[in-house]
UniProtKB/Swiss-Prot annotation:
This is UDP-3-O-acylglucosamine N-acyltransferase. It catalyses: a UDP-3-O-[(3R)-3-hydroxyacyl]-alpha-D-glucosamine + a (3R)-hydroxyacyl-[ACP] = a UDP-2-N,3-O-bis[(3R)-3-hydroxyacyl]-alpha-D-glucosamine + holo-[ACP] + H(+). GO terms for molecular function: N-acyltransferase activity. Its EC number is 2.3.1.191. Catalyzes the N-acylation of UDP-3-O-acylglucosamine using 3-hydroxyacyl-ACP as the acyl donor. Is involved in the biosynthesis of lipid A, a phosphorylated glycolipid that anchors the lipopolysaccharide to the outer membrane of the cell. Belongs to the transferase hexapeptide repeat family. LpxD subfamily. It comes from Helicobacter pylori (strain HPAG1).
């Protein structure tokens, strides 16, 4: 699609000089000369210097930072312009839904009844697909994988060897991403990335792992994920990490290896948790966490020894307050 057609179709008002063929939307550091990117925060301006993007949505006040080789597409709201443009690159679940039927052409794979498989799907030997599984176009499944009933794999999801996914889990659905108009209306960002799950991963029942805006949501080798977990777009879970039930990871959370998330932990987006760190149940994480540390606490999570001191201090003060209250009541009683 030509740049002029893209801007016209999605009502994006800006000026341009070179009407090039646009292939995709991409991150600044991964873009090619036929890609468009955007900058919505000043901290990303430093990426312009080495970016190969053909054009970038950007505010006028920051447009002087754009290299001459790249077109500055000046708009009031770069995030909104990007959201509108993303609709041109939406990838269908089934490109030809009328032609989808129960599969018959996979060798050395056990596929039970009522499984729906799209076009261009690859499934490795000795994999087992239970009833009710739905596999969208372009999915790649390695050897010795097990998909339990009603698992759904969205388009272009990749499972490496020895992956087990339990019933009802959804891998590769759209992330929760929206831009906002001046009136507060929400404009959906079409997520055109994928989910990649490396080998020897096990995922519990009714867990959701969202596809990336672009690039990959990545679950690395040996990760174990419990039931009822939500993993947002563009997250990266390090090797052999453990995620216990009802954890919620906001978009672009990344971790080192062997991180442990206790039950019901919530973590804000664009944060990093260092390797071998453990986070106690119900903790709320709002900042980067260093490696080789234990954290606990509701709001916010803190180093576990601090949390224990905090609880002790809270308990001591509460007891003192109770004693003071009782003494005051006793004094009042005897005065009367």
């Amino acid at each position: 699609m030509k740049l002029s057609e893209l801007l016209s179709t999605y009502s994006i008002e800006t000026e341009f000089s070179n009407d090039f063929e646009v292939h995709a939307l991409a991150e600044l550091d991964k873009a090619t000369p036929n890609d468009i990117s955007y900058i919505d925060q000043a901290r990303y301006l430093k990426l312009l210097k080495d970016s190969k993007a053909g054009a970038v949505f950007i505010r006028k006040k920051e447009s002087s930072k754009v290299p001459k080789r790249m077109q500055a597409l000046i708009v009031d709201n770069p995030h909104l312009a990007f959201a509108k443009a993303s609709h041109a690159f939406k990838i269908p679940f089934f490109k030809n839904p009328e032609s989808v039927s129960e599969p018959k052409h996979f060798k050395k794979v056990t596929i039970m009844p009522n499984v729906m498989i799209g076009e261009g799907v690859e499934i490795g030997e000795n994999s087992l697909i239970y009833p009710g599984v739905v596999i969208a176009d372009g999915v790649k499944i390695g050897k010795n994988c097990v998909l339990y009933p009603r698992v759904i794999l969205y388009q272009n999801t990749i499972l490496e060897d020895n992956v087990t996914i339990h019933a009802g889990s959804v891998i590769g659905g759209d992330g929760f991403g929206y831009a906002h108009t001046a009136l507060g209306e929400h404009v959906k960002i079409e997520h055109v990335g994928i989910v990649r799950i490396q080998k020897n991963v096990e995922i519990g029942a009714n867990t959701a792992i969202d596809r990336a805006v672009f690039g990959e949501t990545l679950i690395k080798e040996g990760v174990k994920i419990d039931n009822l977990v939500q993993i947002g777009h563009n997250c990266v879970l390090g090797e052999h990490s453990i995620v216990v039930s009802q954890v919620g990871l906001s978009g672009s959370t990344t971790t080192g290896r062997n991180v442990v998330f206790g039950g019901q932990v919530g973590i804000g987006g664009h944060l990093h948790v260092g390797e071998f760190t453990q986070i106690g149940g119900k903790s709320a994480v709002g900042k980067d966490l260093p490696p080789n540390t234990n954290f606990a606490g509701a709001i916010p999570a803190m180093e576990i020894h601090e949390w224990h001191h905090f609880l002790a201090h809270l308990r001591t003060n509460f007891r003192k307050q109770q004693k003071t209250s009782l003494l005051q009541k006793a004094k009042g009683f005897f005065k009367s």
